[in-house]
Amino acid sequence: MSEKIYEYKDENNWFIGKMTGHNLISGWGVKHRTIKKIDDLLDGIAATLDWENPKGYDVSVVRYQSPLSLITFIIDMINQETQREIKVIPHAGTILLMENAKLLAVYLPEGGVSTATFFATSEQGFGDTILIATRNEGKTKEFRNLFGQLGYRVENLNDYPELPEVAETGTTFEENARLKAETISHLTGKMVLADDSGLKVDALGDLPGVWSARFSGPDATDAKNNAKLLHELAMVFDQKKRSAQFHTTLVVAAPNKDSLVVEAEWPGYIATQPKGENGFGYDPVFIVGETGRHAAELEADQKNQLSHRGQAVRKLMEVFPAWQAKQS
């Protein structure tokens, strides 16, 4: 049996675990009935056919907000230790455990969910479809990587060429994200995720902000925007005074539901010249925190763990099941 210590930590959850011969969840902030529900859910999944060397999980909870994060953490431990491929899939307010197209178990929120909501599934199978309110394939790729890990199918507006462009007339990130999500949800009848993201540079009074995509004018491109940003900061030589944050506001809208809003930021600095071949937008000129690395030097999985968008999606996943169940 592995002696590896596993750990997951974010703003709202902190778990430490190892594999033992029995199942145990202990710690702070988790109700006893929640622990029992999760233990019942996972009973038998952690076991193997090797009865002489049974595998169980021993998890200490330091900080807790969501069963989705805790279940995902435990399943990741089990997968790594047993070479299984169990997927954790949020679906209609529930959490499904699936492997090789087989449904193994279902976690229900307090109060359950309606059968109409649960079985309102397309022929493609279990898992929710998210329509991303963008035609930007770079942004869609990031969301697809993030949501794909959680079992979601991702579409974008390129799949719906007949839809009109939604003018981003808001003066805040939330206003713009709401405009896109709620307008497109109304037009399509679908669940829609919209984000408004941008770069806030302290020395420029939080510009380019909501105008990040068109900072260099009506014919803006990533290269033109980066060039203008570097020009605006040309006389700012101290890196500490070139501090900046990538910001994301996510809004999920669905017919006859109150919209869900989450926000996140990614701190760093603006470099004096671009570097790196990955990412898009301002990634080549954004130095990640105190690392000295540019965002465009990160591989997709690294960026998703750190970025404003990755943080926002993880926050969204924490509150999404309860929102979905409450609104159904």
Curated annotation (Swiss-Prot):
Name listed for the protein in its UniProt record: dITP/XTP pyrophosphatase
Organism this protein belongs to: Streptococcus pyogenes serotype M6 (strain ATCC BAA-946 / MGAS10394)
EC number: 3.6.1.66
SS bond list: none
Positions bound to substrate: T134, R135, N136, E137, G138, K139, S197, F280, G281, Y282, D283, K303, H308, R309
Entry's Gene Ontology BP terms: nucleotide metabolic process; purine nucleoside triphosphate catabolic process
UniProt family annotation: Belongs to the HAM1 NTPase family.
Pfam families given in the database record: Ham1p_like (PF01725)
Cofactor: how and how many bound: Binds 1 Mg(2+) ion per subunit.
Region Unknown, annotated ranges: 1-129
Keywords: Hydrolase, Magnesium, Metal-binding, Nucleotide metabolism, Nucleotide-binding
Function: Pyrophosphatase that catalyzes the hydrolysis of nucleoside triphosphates to their monophosphate derivatives, with a high preference for the non-canonical purine nucleotides XTP (xanthosine triphosphate), dITP (deoxyinosine triphosphate) and ITP. Seems to function as a house-cleaning enzyme that removes non-canonical purine nucleotides from the nucleotide pool, thus preventing their incorporation into DNA/RNA and avoiding chromosomal lesions.
GO molecular function, one term: ITP diphosphatase activity
GO terms under cellular component: cytosol
InterPro entries the UniProt entry points to: dITP/XTP_pyrophosphatase, ITPase-like_fam, RdgB/HAM1
NCBIfam families: PRK02491.1, PRK14822.1, RdgB/HAM1 family non-canonical purine NTP pyrophosphatase
Assembly information from the UniProt record: Homodimer.
Catalysed reactions listed for this entry: XTP + H2O = XMP + diphosphate + H(+); dITP + H2O = dIMP + diphosphate + H(+); ITP + H2O = IMP + diphosphate + H(+)
Cofactor: Mg(2+)
Coiled-coil features, chain-numbered ranges: none
EC supergroup of this enzyme: hydrolase
Species classification: Bacteria, Bacillati, Bacillota, Bacilli, Lactobacillales
Active-site residues (renumbered): D196
Region annotation (NTP pyrophosphatase) ranges: 130-324
Record-listed Mg(2+) binding positions: D196
